[in-house]
């Protein structure tokens, strides 16, 4: 009888998930209520496509006709990540502006700072006034890529998008209720929610009663962000369609297999596969037989996607990436997830607390835009403001560059990739690098977002 009872207890206990190291049950209020989620894989955020990472040769795929020598080939590894299938459209950005207008109704400067610069269409010797007035807002252009957005504005949009997606996920999971009365001083952000500053109205998720979602629940997603240069180039090439037995069977010059610019599909033979400038004065071809069919950007879902399913990774608009520009980054950056532009920030736990940093390690380690290129490690001066000063490091790290006199490169120079509707074929190669200041904008530059992939490296 005792043996039978033991079996019954054992069978009953086996149905309850328990710790393999302590034996205590999970999800049991009587044991303290340590909750583990049934979710094991990351939720795929709206608009994203899984990009399975791997090793590839990053850098020039064409002859360097401009002799810039800023993208010499080298082998690197990129971790798996997610990326927007299309460029961010005018409609997507108008949704952002609408939210800001509603929440920051008493702060018009916030809204004004987020608006695209429509004057980027203006040209002293070209009639583009209609584009200034209607391109961003008219419904005819709602599916066209947003332009006139600076690198800073693109980052702000990505942060806003992260919060709106996470807010919707919490609402769908029953962890939060809708709140259409959010204000500048009280609105949902992921950080505010996790810190307990924004509470909303939570609902029950376990038997203990109401509680907020946590990272451990697997509901909240990582931040949307701009892709790194390496991620963008890797995704644009789409070599996953050219691999066999752990080898790349054929390198690509462009995001498509052919070294030409026209489709070899029998149904579309001779059609251009991207939106670009064919030659001087030829933006779309001849009436009755247009080639790419667009004098300006085309809708974000146009032409053919690459092997990852991404649209317009060559042509249409160039795209901002996360990196700070340096012509010799390929010599400096790591061979795993290469990136220049790290800024390490510490959370503020209490005000009026002075950190004792007598050996200046915190200041020197946090600002890595210039690492090995004008930073503390690479300085040749034994005594200067950077090594002895107590002010913000970014004020002194640019000493290596005399910006405006000897160079246009600074800590505010950001990379943008890919050709645009106004560029020739050379710029359609994903390896080509260009840069602008992070607060500048152009009628030829847009952006798309990316997100870290958590867990398995396999694309799902």
Q: What role is predicted for each listed range?
A:
Residues 1-11:
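Sec-dependent bacterial lipoprotein signal peptides
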Residues 11-33, 37-39, 64, 137-145, ...:
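Disulfide-stabilized, aromatic/cysteine-rich ligand-recognition loop
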Residues 14, 81-276, 322-328, 338-390, ...:
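Active-site microenvironments of metalloenzymes and redox enzymes
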Residues 29-44, 208-214:
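A short, compositionally biased domain-edge/stem linker segment
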Residues 43-60:
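Mature N-terminal segment immediately following signal peptide/propeptide cleavage
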Residues 45, 220-221, 303-306:
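Short, small/polar residue-rich loop motifs at catalytic or cofactor-binding pockets
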Residues 60-78, 266-275, 428-436:
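Short, polar loop/linker segments at the starts of domains and inter-domain junctions
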